[in-house]
Amino acid sequence: LIATVKRELLVRHLEAWAPAALHRARRVIYAHGYADAQSGASAEAAARVLAEQTDFVRGRELTMLLVGDDVTPVADRLAGIPELALLSMHAVSGGTEERFGVALKAASAQRVPLLGFLDAASASEPPSPATVAALTAGKPAEVLLALAPGVSAEAYRAGWPLFTAVELATGDEPGELLAFGTTSGKSLEGFKEALWAVDEFAGVRYRDPADPDRHLIDISLSPHPGPLRREILAHLGRVGSATVTELRTFALTETIYRAADATRVLHTLADSGAVTRRPPHGRLGGDVVISLP
């Protein structure tokens, strides 16, 4: 079930990323690490999304890198799918940890739109920070990274101006961690929209790694605000006061929620007297200062 949620998130993100990247640049690269995991199911899903972009591709170069322990069977299978005939694919075996950075260099992935997907949740070891950081050579650059339960995403933040993580959980025990790093604020907003728009799969819920109460949240277009409320109050306890704009940015970058969710929570907190606002009346605009009473 968690694999299905990850795959749907990847597909949704690719559907938004690929046309925008092809509109921006003549060369675009998508790099899929651990591509032989789960018999290449997520690699095939990604390839099908990219192949649908052939309308955009005329006169442009869209390349998919498949990197893993032994990706030849996956690459051969994908090569036999007629719909994928126009997609340029390069398969690199020998291990994601060992070959990912090398494959990016060989594909001249510097200063071109670059998205990497690394599902290391079932790998024997998580990728090194250097392997993930190799993607920052792109411009703009993005990464979707899945980690096994209990593995922290903190070591991977370096090099990414914007970085967020969400736990995919089925119960009280720690779940897989899905991290997203990007150089684009607009892309982070798009990822958050996709996060809450995926189909609700029975038993799979989100947990915000920053929520001290480890509250499980149903996947919904209107997510339960409890964890965000706690995180905003804790943040205000640390910083003293912040503008609405700063708190919207905090929600977007430091929690699993969207900026719009923060606006709704701030209205509720202000109306209940849990926070004070300056000025005390009028619209809750971006420059209104929020603090604890």
Protein language model features and the residues they cover:
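S-adenosyl-L-methionine
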Residues: L1-V57, D70-V112, T245, I256-V275, P279, ...
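Flexible, charged surface loops at secondary-structure boundaries
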Residues: L22-R26, V57-G59, A107-R111, A137
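Residue-level recognition of the N-termini of beta-strands and the immediately preceding loop/turn
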Residues: A25-I29, G59-M64, L87-M89, L114
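Structural motif
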Residues: G33-A37, L66-D70, G94, F117-S122, ...
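Short, aromatic/basic amphipathic alpha-helical patches
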Residues: A46-L50, P73-A85, T131, S152-Y156
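Membrane helical hairpin/interfacial module
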Residues: V49-L78
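Class I S-adenosyl-L-methionine
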Residues: K105-L114, S122-R278, L284-L292
